[in-house]
A protein has these predicted regions:
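Extreme N-terminal tail/first-helix region
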Residues: 1-29
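Alpha-helix boundary recognition
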Residues: 23-24, 73-74, 113
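Short beta-strand or tight-loop elements
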Residues: 27, 43, 76, 136
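A short mixed-secondary-structure module that forms the rim of ligand-binding clefts
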Residues: 48-87
């Protein structure tokens, strides 16, 4: 019996734009972290993604709560899952890095403030961020993906379309 050949992995240059389009359309992601005992915790967050043509980087404007900080100190890997009612889903597995320097926080603030609808929004609407990007309760979380999956709902519902998966 002959072995089936491994399917060719699509290039990041094919998967990343499809991922960004779907993620920015869906907007909200379930983001999972793991504590020091290996127990997962999820929360709903609002990432924004930048595709340079060579590199995909995600950013989350978030409060650096003690729980998030402890989880990411213990294990800096996060899993993001997006879903919409048409069953379009996309996932990103990433290394997360806290960014507390003022230049990065201002840049991420501006990414959201000037981002296209529906992913863009004014971060100043969050009461604890009233002091702007230098607020103690505002941090930038950088996401560097090592795996992406884009799964159009049409694949599930009608058997049409293509699932795209990339990993580093």
């Amino acid at each position: 019996m002959s072995e089936r050949p491994e399917p060719l992995q699509p290039a990041l240059s094919e998967v990343a734009p499809a991922f960004v389009e779907m993620a920015h359309r869906i907007v909200w992601a379930s983001v999972a972290t793991v504590d020091a005992q290996g127990r997962p915790r999820t929360r709903i967050l609002h990432p924004i993604w930048e595709w340079s043509g060579d590199e995909l980087t995600g950013w989350i404007a978030t409060a650096p709560t003690p729980v998030k900080r402890a989880h990411l100190d213990a294990n800096p890997q996060v899993s993001l899952a997006y879903w919409d009612p048409s069953h379009d889903t996309c996932n990103a597995e990433c290394r997360a890095t806290w960014m507390f320097d003022e230049a990065t926080r201002r840049r991420v603030w501006d990414l959201f403030a000037n981002g296209p609808a529906p992913v863009g929004y004014d971060p100043a609407i969050v009461p604890v961020w009233a002091d702007g990007p230098t607020s103690e309760s505002f941090a930038a979380l950088r996401l560097d993906p090592w795996r992406l999956r884009v799964f159009p709902g049409t694949v599930l519902i009608r058997g049409e379309g293509t699932v795209l998966t990339w990993h580093a």
